[in-house]
């Protein structure tokens, strides 16, 4: 007997589809980026993660490359801004190892939680078991399709109305990246 992935669409606003795998609480984002002024495949490097941090300073306190293993493998430390302090939610951080794989007309970034050797404030709480896969396929030089599948375990018992918070915050961050790239001029 095969098990089927059960997904629920959470939000389709701004031409970004956010859905949730209800069996394992993982999220999936799908969207296109198009800009006739920019050769988009040239932008799809590890630098995209730094751009994510620069455009989302209200969500992310910092994104730091803590170690570079090669041109295709790095460790990243995300420190999130605190939200929900009045609900007893502590400030979070996440440390991941990211690997990039380039193929014909496609690049894939995979990440998973990794041990952090950097000094971390004891008040911060680790987001555990973080995993993601981002696949960027280009239709042509000026249009790419992005698929981002991610999951992370947060220790807090969030109220039911906040169960999709991680997905919605991630969508907001990628919306800003999409908008920034689509509005770039040479």
Protein language model features and the residues they cover:
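Glycine-rich portal/gate segments that line the openings of hydrophobic small-molecule binding cavities
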Residues: 22-24, 33, 61-121
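Beta-strand/loop substructures that line and gate deep hydrophobic ligand-binding cavities in soluble
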Residues: 94-98, 110-167
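C-terminal functional regions of eukaryotic proteins
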Residues: 169-179
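Generic detection of long, well-ordered alpha-helical segments
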Residues: 41-42, 163, 167, 171
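A generic structural motif
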Residues: 35, 83-86, 152-158
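Short, highly charged C-terminal tails/helix-capping segments
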Residues: 180-186
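Hydrophobic ligand-binding cavity/cleft-lining segments
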Residues: 1-77, 87
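Hydrophobic pocket/interface hotspot
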Residues: 39-45, 98, 148, 177
């Amino acid at each position: 007997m095969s098990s089927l992935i059960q997904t629920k669409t959470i939000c389709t606003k701004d031409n970004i589809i956010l859905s949730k795998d209800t069996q394992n609480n993982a999220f999936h984002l799908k969207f296109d980026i198009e800009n006739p002024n920019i050769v988009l495949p040239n932008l799809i490097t590890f630098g995209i993660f730094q751009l994510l941090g620069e455009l989302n300073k209200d969500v992310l306190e910092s994104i730091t490359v803590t170690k570079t293993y090669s041109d295709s493998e790095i460790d990243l430390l995300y420190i999130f801004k605190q939200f929900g302090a009045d609900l007893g939610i502590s400030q979070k951080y996440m440390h991941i190892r990211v690997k990039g794989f380039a193929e014909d007309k496609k690049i894939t970034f995979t990440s998973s939680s990794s041990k952090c050797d950097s000094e971390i404030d004891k008040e911060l709480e680790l987001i555990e078991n973080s995993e993601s896969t981002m696949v960027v396929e280009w239709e042509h030089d000026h249009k790419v399709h992005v698929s981002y599948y991610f999951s992370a375990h947060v220790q807090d018992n969030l109220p039911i109305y906040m169960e999709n918070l991680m997905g919605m915050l991630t969508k907001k961050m990628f919306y800003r990246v999409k908008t920034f790239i689509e509005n770039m001029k040479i």
